[in-house]
Amino acid sequence: MEKYILSIDQGTTSSRAILFNQKGEIAGVAQREFKQYFPQSGWVEHDANEIWTSVLAVMTEVINENDVRADQIAGIGITNQRETTVVWDKHTGRPIYHAIVWQSRQTQSICSELKQQGYEQTFRDKTGLLLDPYFAGTKVKWILDNVEGAREKAENGDLLFGTIDTWLVWKLSGKAAHITDYSNASRTLMFNIHDLEWDDELLELLTVPKNMLPEVKASSEVYGKTIDYHFYGQEVPIAGVAGDQQAALFGQACFERGDVKNTYGTGGFMLMNTGDKAVKSESGLLTTIAYGIDGKVNYALEGSIFVSGSAIQWLRDGLRMINSAPQSESYATRVDSTEGVYVVPAFVGLGTPYWDSEARGAIFGLTRGTEKEHFIRATLESLCYQTRDVMEAMSKDSGIDVQSLRVDGGAVKNNFIMQFQADIVNTSVERPEIQETTALGAAFLAGLAVGFWESKDDIAKNWKLEEKFDPKMDEGEREKLYRGWKKAVEATQVFKTE
């Protein structure tokens, strides 16, 4: 009887369940979208119960649609949108407020106040993160401060906090396991990534009671089992958890120090495995935990690009220059260059290494001869320039020269982007056969814990290259183009609207 690992990939707009066989191949996929809530400008929320319902639905669907029985599932792995915060009543199991999503800016004033009080460096040193609304800690404080009776309940030990992984494990296990893993804990602003413990000083600054917090576990171990009524009468081990970007790093088999992956999703996320050393960044990168296995933690440097694949959506939906995302490639390759046009897609500011939230998008170098093809090509090239910005910051901070870049996400199907990426970073770009690397990473973590795979070496053999893009551009051309990009970014930062 063939066995499978069931991977739950709980994302920002949809929940997915993917079955993987022993070769790491996909044996079935189910997906369901859920509602986004925008109660005020800049606020983004989800209903945690709707997320839970969507996860139950896709788990059921992937098993039913693929003629798989529940007793063929060897283990369950979970990967999740990181930082999104749920606070719920531990007796009723009901969330006391919507889940506050990672994108939501509603805790800006809390962050500003803590900065004014001089605590920014304290958070940076202990957590490796910036004091920003992006991360979970200030979201928990906001819920306790703004939901009537919440703080009193929390002090009495009646409330639980969790990121989405914690919420799902708690629900799946029938309230038996209130846990998170090192990778998700490291995104909360409350976890000391050096001591590997919840930090009392940070909790005091955020006024969050410690009794709400989940137990922090390895990214690969059996946390509990599915309660029989949620899973066809079967008690299946829940055995792997990692935040989405860290799961993608693991799914790309980036197990060695200096291994790098870049995800081209709506935004872009680059992670470098820095081994057992938490590298302090001087270049606007985050220091984070990649994963914890067998009592050992691996750290990572992370760079965030706010606009990546969404720039292509903008060409399609906003400007109506293309009818479909794949069309952008054929337009871009009709011309040999952009003729000096640069697009800086700072629609919501600039991420790593600039961290300029006030910047807005700009276009430079237009002439009467500029055509649609030049504009589209310049937009695609912007994804690659931003990636080089992050990669240079990583090399500088870590002292490691990147030997190859493993890639995933929607935009990697675009061969023009992949080749230009290799050219502009002067490094080989490796596109894997299985691009569902986030779900695959969660499956690998769960599979290791239940003996489905023996070791990381065993897993690395499952990683298969679809295509390798080697740099073809000469040095002079590459550096000239990149100098132009740096000038364009500089000019973008000068222009600020009132």
From Swiss-Prot:
Regulation affecting activity: Activated by phosphorylation and inhibited by fructose 1,6-bisphosphate (FBP).
Amino-acid positions noted as binding glycerol in the UniProt annotation, renumbered to this chain: 82-83, 134, 244-245
Entry binding sites for ATP: 12-14, 266, 309, 313, 410
Molecular-function annotations in GO: ATP binding; glycerol kinase activity
Positions bound to sn-glycerol 3-phosphate: 12, 82-83, 134, 244
Keyword Membrane: no
Catalytic activity: glycerol + ATP = sn-glycerol 3-phosphate + ADP + H(+)
Any one biological process term the GO annotation gives: glycerol catabolic process
Keyword Phosphoprotein belongs to the record: yes
Subunit structure: Homotetramer and homodimer (in equilibrium).
Function: Key enzyme in the regulation of glycerol uptake and metabolism. Catalyzes the phosphorylation of glycerol to yield sn-glycerol 3-phosphate.
Family statement drawn from the similarity comment of this UniProt entry: Belongs to the FGGY kinase family.
Name of the molecule in the record: Glycerol kinase
